[in-house]
């Protein structure tokens, strides 16, 4: 087994459990993940050392695509040399934010981000209202609307995060954005 294969095995050790939890959440959200691009998978860590360990591991499998400051903290986007299969899609981006003051009950795989594009001539508020309508009647879910602020970024980045209200069994989250992260990065570089 090569070093890359060993690293990918370590990287994906908990991925199958995470995938099942995400599929359960998607079912409760009444969305079919195959209808949407899974843009990237995201990790959460509570310490600088955990972040460093994950970054070392991820860099053995890929390269830094971005290390922007988002909402006051550095978030690494790692582009994998070999995409991982997740929910019958191949995903090549892993998000690794440096820790902030919040403590996560479970470190490791935390959320995915999917793309629900704007409709023609749709405003940000119209997009938020449209996406929100999918989930408002689902009382077992928590919905959080935000717009992450990336230093120097001008493209609107609304986000709708959906998770279970009771996180004791399933702590995962599905975040919805109108653009893929690669499109954001291309747009930022072309300005």
UniProtKB/Swiss-Prot annotation:
Disulfide bonds: none annotated. To E.coli YecM. Gene3D superfamilies: 2,3-Dihydroxybiphenyl 1,2-Dioxygenase, domain 1. It holds the Pfam family YecM. GO terms for cellular component: cytosol. This is Uncharacterized protein HI_1581/HI_1582.
